[in-house]
Amino acid sequence: MEAIESIVTAHLDTWNSPAGPERVQAIASVYAPDVVIGEPQGTLTGHEGMEQAIAALQSQLPGTELSRSGPIQVAQDLVTYAWTLGSPDGPRVASGRDVLFLRGQDVVGLYVVVDAP
């Protein structure tokens, strides 16, 4: 379970990191080159798609951070947990659940489920 927790932490850290070379490097180390990102507004693929998804969230809701808000649950290569999104000193603006599919230590699929307001 420690390895899974490490992957989830690296995933959330990547989504919270600012644009730049460090985020590009983090994306390459956490996600498979052919990663699929399924979000309510559409599907993206690959490292470039991951960068686009992160950049879109950060530009839409600047100053917010994702935090895990529930236990990590695992079934074979599927990992899921609840999250909240908000500013460090403010209220949460969204909540939901991530579903990750793993291949070894790489995330090959990320599906984002956003709770209804």
Regions found by a protein language model. Give the residues of each.
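Short glycine/serine/proline-enriched coil/turn segments at secondary-structure junctions
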Residues: A75, P88-R92
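Short acidic-aromatic low-complexity motifs
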Residues: M1-V30
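A solvent-exposed, acidic/Ser-Thr-rich amphipathic alpha-helical stretch
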Residues: R23-D77
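Short beta-strand segments that buttress and anchor functional surface loops
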Residues: Y81-P88
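Short, ordered coil/turn segments that flank beta-strands lining enzyme active or ligand-binding pockets
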Residues: P33, P88, R103
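Short, surface-exposed coil-to-beta transition loops
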Residues: E65-S67, P91-D98
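Short hydrophobic/aromatic-rich beta-strand segments that constitute the beta-sheet cores
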Residues: I37, Y81, G109-L110
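Short beta-strand edge/turn micro-motifs at domain boundaries
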Residues: S95-P117
